[in-house]
Regions:
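Active-site environment of divalent metal-dependent phosphoester hydrolases
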Residues: 1, 39-42, 68-81, 107, ...
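A short helix->loop->beta-strand "cap" motif at the edges of active sites that frequently abuts
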Residues: 28, 62-67, 167-170
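Divalent metal-coordination and catalytic microenvironments
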Residues: 31, 36, 52, 72, ...
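Short, electropositive alpha-helical surface patch
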Residues: 46-61, 84-95, 188-204
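Conserved beta-sheet core of the metallophosphoesterase superfamily
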Residues: 152-217
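Accessory, non-catalytic peripheral segments of nucleic-acid enzymes
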Residues: 210-243
Length: 243
């Protein structure tokens, strides 16, 4: 969020007070990131890079945690190709901790196969569709823009990819949209924290997938960035309630 100190402090609290403590307590050593690691697809400054390294990437190394990450649309410089992307350019010093998924592939997590699909663009669209037809994994993870799902609370996506391509899978886990929602086998996990005002009041989670039972557990992030204050302006003013 434009390297705002307010947002960076908020995100640091999430990682230090919520996310990493939960992983350490439950001995979780593997993260699967479904895309959109960075915010601005065109540029990022040194302040944001330094902050991200200290509060997240260095912690992966310190705690012995690895992360598989799929390209999201915010990670790619161009809209018609994924070739130039922030993940390759900026995470080269963490290759032991970070595995960047550039092409559709099947990963094996403790015996559970998960098909991972990067952001679908004109250049890789046919490759991704062919993969979805032949993939033998029961679960798909991908940053998807599917018609009929909420992008943010109360704002449905009126265009986008048809969900029929995913009908044969047991479970589809996707990011991209900020709102958490589910329809049949497709689960939008939503953002794990608040980024915009339309996130206000919409509970945020990260999720834990049990590779044995295939059960998914949402873990609530209690930290918020935005709050709405309601008051009777015939009796109070904003100044009085803020004091």
């Amino acid at each position: 969020r434009n390297s705002s100190d307010i947002f960076m402090d908020y995100q640091e609290r999430f990682y230090t007070e919520v996310f990493f403590p939960y992983l350490l307590k439950n001995n979780i050593k593997q993260i699967l990131h479904l895309g959109d690691y960075y915010d601005n697809r065109k540029t990022i400054n040194f302040k944001a890079l330094n902050h991200n390294r200290k509060i997240f990437l260095d912690k992966l190394r310190e705690y012995g945690i690895t992360m598989d990450i799929i390209l999201g649309n915010h990670d790619t410089y161009y809209k018609n190709t994924n070739e130039l992307n922030a993940l390759k350019e900026l995470q080269g010093h963490y290759m032991n901790e970070v595995n960047i998924i550039l092409d559709p592939t099947v990963m094996n997590y403790d015996g559970l196969k998960v098909g991972l699909v990067p952001w679908i663009c004109p250049e890789n669209e046919q490759q991704c569709l062919d993969f979805l037809e032949s993939c033998d994994a029961p679960i798909i993870g991908a940053p998807l823009e599917l018609k009929g799902f909420e992008m943010s609370k109360g704002m449905p996506c009126m265009d986008g990819m048809d969900r029929k391509h995913f009908d044969r899978f047991e479970m589809v886990l996707t990011g991209h949209f900020h709102a958490k929602s589910s329809q049949q086998n497709i689960h939008y996990l939503g953002a794990q924290m608040e980024f915009f005002w339309n996130d206000c009041g919409d509970k945020k989670y990260f999720h834990v997938l049990d590779t044995e039972t295939r059960e998914m557990t949402p873990v609530h992030n209690p930290l918020t960035m935005f709050e709405k204050c309601f008051y009777d302006d015939t009796k109070e003013s904003f100044e009085t309630i803020s004091n």
